[in-house]
Amino acid sequence: MPPPAGLLPWPSPSTTRLTTPTPTRPPPRTTRVRPPTPPPPPPPYTRVRLPPPPPPPKTTLPPPRLEPAAPKPTAASTPLPPDTASNAASSSTCLDCVHFGKCSGCTHEVDLDKPPVLQEVASFFKVHGVGDFTFSRGRLSQWRCRAKLAIRGTPENPLIGLYQEGTHVVADIPECRAHHPSINAAVKLLRQGISELNIQPYDEDAGTGELRYVQMAVTTYNTSIPVDKRYEQGRVQVSLVWNSRDERSQNAEKLALLIEFLWRNGGPKSSVHLIHSIWANFQTSTSNIIFGHKWRHLKGERDLWERYGGVDISLDPCSFGQANTLSFNSLLHKLNKYVPRGSTVVDLYSGAGVIGLSVAASRKCRSVKCVEINKQSKMSFEKSASRLPTNLGCTITWHNTDASVEPVHWLEGSSVVIVDPPRKGLDPSVISALQKVALSERKAYKAKSSLAKVKDEKRPWILRAREAAVHVDNTSTEESNETWPETLIYISCGWESFKKDCKSLISSKAWQLENAHAFNFFPGTDSIEILAIFKRESEAGQKKRKKAKKKKAK
């Protein structure tokens, strides 16, 4: 019997220890005579009162691989939790997954608390003058709360998992150690439904079959149970990607049967309330794109809520959501401390506005502008913003436009800029705009900005941004056009692109890298999430640098 999903494999008993030879005849009676009573123990002063031998020095039992993997003497090892520092050999830092090697999800199975790239990251920040770099290892197993899984195989033996490295062969991963336990339980239920109802998994070569993919998204938002129980009792939003144009297609009857099976066995009336809601997505394309454009809500609650950074956030199945809920909350908690109270904030590449809304609620900002190119994020933003306190006193807007088109429009009037770009990093136009907000070029930017205001009506990108804008709070705030960003907060999921962008920003002498933190968003991989804080060089500092340069030239 296999171990329950999400748990370590049961150790197999050693047969050599359990098996003893059976004698053909009883041993001679002389060997079974009771031995004589042992003599009394020696006097206490001979042994008992002697002090026990001192324990071996700690240096003789170093945690295996801890010091070689951690950078020395950077601060990267300092913030690691005490249990990691003292018990690095503990199995808690090992993957212990039966699927490792077949599944492409994890690239290493030991030292999950120290991604291989960590030493390079710590060295980079040390070279650039960051003395308080920290690394948050987070939860090392059962951390993934969102998963997109391919479905292949046969009704009798469905394969639900990820593609093997470099192929389109699906590795079945029913006991994935990264998945939240509720995801593994929901996958098990789905597998049972596929077999019992004879659902045909998708055949990628022939383009036939019925069920192509499934997305599992866990919500831990449940105010009816204690806070410390909410994560482990998370419920799953199930999104089935069906190989048809819509719910009126020929095979739609099977889809309805599968949905009823899942809801009956995992819904609120089942013995274990596992499933939060069920959605269907209809996709007939032969490309590698997972989702089609048509979504249908079929069972359960329509809105999936999660608590991020102190605010309630609504996420549709088509919205982007962080896979590691706990680590993302840790990042938001750290980020908010770097936003001065009363700031005017612009959040570029904002998605559904999670970061902007969190900052608005926790830092009493005067205004927050969220800029996002994906129009599908608008509905999630509106729902989330509707739950903010009514007395917030902050003007919050969401703009559906491309931040890379004349980004100076968004930088002007903002004291804090937050950027959370995709893995490729910042657009060149955004980097250029951030470089040019140095104090020496304020006048040029003021003139350009004033000209832009006169030509608003002739610039369709501004009109589109205004039409798509969402205004949450009409509190009047006088934003001075004299304000330019003093703080830049950069969140990065791509280390190589961040290094390039960071060097571009600090080489211009307009920005100084002051703080940096890393988060273990994807244990078992070589990925790392970066939170970096840049400060614009002060006017006094800039003048001092120029004087020193002139003096050196003389």
Language-model features, listed with the residues they occupy:
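Cysteine-cluster motifs in flexible loop/terminal segments that predominantly coordinate metals
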Residues: 78-119, 141-142
